[in-house]
UniProtKB/Swiss-Prot annotation:
Organism superkingdom: Eukaryota
Transmembrane stretches, start-end: 31-51, 75-96, 111-131, 176-196
Protein name from the UniProt record: Cytochrome b
Binding site for a ubiquinone: 199
Main location class: mitochondrion
Species, as recorded: Bothrops bilineatus
Length: 214
C-alpha cells in the first residue's frame, strides 16, 4: 500500500485512491468523464466567442477575423473551441466503441439516451460549422439542410422553416446561431439523464469480478 501521509495534497490523493469502482474498470471507462470535460470547455469558450460573434451573413466572417486578431486571447478561445470539438468526437467514438465491444448496448435505456446524445451532438457541430459563413459553410448549409426535403409530407415545410425563406440567407444564419447556442444546454440535460440511467442500471462487468470493495 502507498503511504500518503507525508505527501503534499494527501487528502486529494487519498480520495482518488479510494474511488469506489471495481477492478474490472479500465482506461476505456475514462472517456465518459473526458466527454464531460470537453462539454464544459466548449460551453465556456463558446460563451466568450458568442459575445464577439455577429449572426449576419455580411458580418459573420469579419467578426471571426476580428475575434482572432483584435480581441485579447480571442485566438486562444477560438482554437480551443475548434480543437476541443474534434477531441469531443474522438472521445465519443471511443466511448461508443468501448460500449459496443463490452456489450453496453444491452442496457437499452442507457444506450438509447446515449444515441440521442450523439445525434444532438452531431447537429450542434453542424450548426457551429456553418457559423463562420465562409464558402464551405454556405455549401454545407445548403447540402445538409436539403436532406430534410426527403422527409415525406413535412420535408419541404421543415426546410423552408429552417432556412427562414426559400433560400439560404440571413434568417438561416440567425436560426443556426440560436440552435448552436441552445443545444449544449440540451446536451447537459440529456447527459444528466444518461448518467442517472447508468447509475440505475450499473456499468457492464466484462471480467465478472466482484466490484463491491466496501
Amino acid at each position: 500500500s502507498i503511504n500518503y501521509k507525508n505527501m503534499p495534497h494527501q487528502h486529494l490523493l487519498t480520495l482518488l485512491s479510494l474511488l469506489p469502482v471495481g477492478s474490472n474498470i479500465s482506461t476505456w471507462w475514462n472517456f465518459g468523464s473526458m466527454l464531460l470535460a470537453c462539454l464544459m470547455t466548449q460551453i465556456i469558450t463558446g460563451f466568450f466567442l458568442a459575445i464577439h460573434y455577429t449572426a449576419n451573413i455580411n458580418l459573420a466572417f469579419s467578426s471571426i477575423i476580428h475575434l482572432s486578431r483584435d480581441v485579447p486571447c480571442g485566438w486562444i478561445m477560438q482554437n480551443t473551441h475548434a480543437i476541443s470539438a474534434s477531441l469531443f468526437f474522438i472521445c465519443i467514438y471511443i466511448h461508443i466503441a468501448r460500449g459496443l465491444y463490452y456489450g453496453s448496448y444491452l442496457y437499452k435505456e442507457v444506450w438509447l439516451s446515449g444515441t440521442t446524445l450523439l445525434i444532438i451532438l452531431m447537429a450542434t457541430a453542424f450548426f457551429g460549422y456553418v457559423l463562420p459563413w465562409g464558402q464551405m459553410s454556405f455549401w454545407a448549409a445548403t447540402v445538409i439542410t436539403n436532406l430534410l426535403t426527403a422527409i415525406p409530407y413535412l420535408g419541404t415545410t421543415l426546410t423552408t422553416w429552417l432556412w427562414g425563406g426559400f433560400a439560404i440567407n440571413d434568417p438561416t444564419l440567425t436560426r443556426f446561431f440560436a440552435l448552436h447556442f441552445i443545444f449544449p444546454f440540451i446536451i447537459i440535460s440529456m447527459s444528466s439523464i444518461h448518467i442517472l440511467l447508468l447509475h440505475n442500471e450499473g456499468s457492464s462487468n466484462p471480467l465478472g469480478t466482484n466490484s463491491d470493495i466496501g
